[in-house]
Regions:
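Solvent-exposed loop/turn and edge beta-strand elements of beta-rich ligand-binding domains
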Residues: 1-210
């Protein structure tokens, strides 16, 4: 009898959801990589001719898929007790984010989140590799590092990146100037109102003296 080596395979397709609030869906690019520096990252772009769902709050949503990843038995770590590879397993780590363009769309605030994806691939001893993925947010949408906690562990299978459109958003780097201007304007208005009240009070006082 000819010996046939034991083999098994499994697949997993990483997905993301792109959401826009307050505006229309544009061509946004998302990146997927097996390293935190996103070297040689795979990319997907929102499809303006594809299915775009309108959410309950009026936003626009589209789910995108990266290329399918295939796992083979020789990629996994065999059990010391089974040289055939049955029951072998391995953990893989990936990262996903939205690409921040050098020329962003006007009045859109981009989501700067980064998610770390942990994929567990386990041979089920019946020629199939079972693949499960868990997601953890490691950078929030404002670009800040997320501290270690459980609030950013996701139970769903599609990390969501939300961009916000607003004509009232200050231009990048101008928020401080805008706030200073508004504060100064408020002070001037208050001073003008106080002077107007003083003039009316003085005028009434003059009339009484006559």
């Amino acid at each position: 009898n000819k010996y046939t080596p034991y083999t098994s395979t499994g697949t997993w397709t990483p997905k993301v959801t792109k959401v826009v609030k307050g505006g229309e869906m544009k061509e946004f690019k998302l990146e997927f990589a097996d390293n935190a520096d996103f070297k040689n990252a795979k990319t997907v772009v929102t499809n303006l001719k594809g299915e775009i769902i309108t959410t309950a709050d009026g936003g626009k949503s589209q789910t995108l898929s990266f290329d399918k990843i295939e796992y083979k038995l020789d990629q996994l770590n065999k059990l010391p007790t089974d040289s055939t590879g049955r029951g072998a397993s391995k953990t893989f780590t990936y990262y996903v984010r939205e690409q921040q363009p050098t020329t962003p769309f006007t009045n859109y605030k981009y989501d700067q989140s980064i998610y770390q994806i942990t994929v567990n691939a386990v041979d089920n001893t019946d020629h199939k590799i079972n693949v499960t993925a868990t997601y953890k947010q490691i950078q929030d949408r404002d670009g800040n590092e997320v501290t270690t906690d459980t609030d950013h562990n996701l139970t769903d299978s599609t990390p969501t990146f939300t961009n916000t459109y607003s004509t009232s958003l200050p231009l990048s780097g101008m928020s401080g100037v805008t706030l200073t201007y508004l504060a100064g304007a408020a002070v001037l208005c208050a001073a003008a109102a106080w002077m107007h009240i003083r003039r009316k009070a003085n005028a009434k006082g003059g009339e009484r003296r006559e």
